[in-house]
Amino acid sequence: MAEVANNEEQAPQFNIQRVYTKDISFETPNSPAVFQKEWTPEVKLDLDTRSNKLSDDVYEVVLSLTVTAKNGEETAFLCEVQQAGIFAITGLTEQQLAHSLGAYCPNVLFPYAREAVGSLVSRGTFPQLNLAPVNFDALFAQYVQQRQAAAAEAPAEEANA
């Protein structure tokens, strides 16, 4: 019977406790002149994630999106959204937890951030902006590879010193 209880405690669990907007900003530095020009924007998306441990098995993950639209040389708008979530995560290995915080949680948060960006852009009276889905699993794998490469280079540099 105790064995069954231990197995239940070890089973991975993932619960979303809260999803919220942590920070939001929309700027149109060249309005109203930007509305008088032909609309041929160049849109750039920057994103970042970070996480911090709030308590045992409870983590905050923050997905930051910055969307910059330039019309020619002028900035048409700058939109920044920090979408956050509080997640209770138990029963994972360190590697699985890192993947959850770096890829799975941002996947949960992205639709909320995308909607916030779209709403802000519309309220700024710009044409609708539909952000494409982001493959956070691939971005996390790339991040892990970069860290491993940097770790492999560090001992080599120390040996040469």
Swiss-Prot record:
GO MF term set: unfolded protein binding
Record-linked Gene3D superfamilies: SecB-like
Keyword Signal: no
UniProt superkingdom: Bacteria
InterPro entries to which the protein is assigned, alphabetical: SecB, SecB-like_sf
Keywords: Chaperone, Cytoplasm, Protein transport, Translocation, Transport
Keyword Cytoplasm among UniProt keywords: yes
UniProt subcellular location: Cytoplasm
Pfam families the UniProt entry points to: SecB
Record-level GO BP terms: protein folding; protein tetramerization; protein transport
GO-annotated cellular components: cytoplasm
Subunit structure, as described in the record: Homotetramer, a dimer of dimers. One homotetramer interacts with 1 SecA dimer.
UniProt function note: One of the proteins required for the normal export of preproteins out of the cell cytoplasm. It is a molecular chaperone that binds to a subset of precursor proteins, maintaining them in a translocation-competent state. It also specifically binds to its receptor SecA.
Family: Belongs to the SecB family.
UniProt protein name: Protein-export protein SecB
Native organism: Shewanella piezotolerans (strain WP3 / JCM 13877)
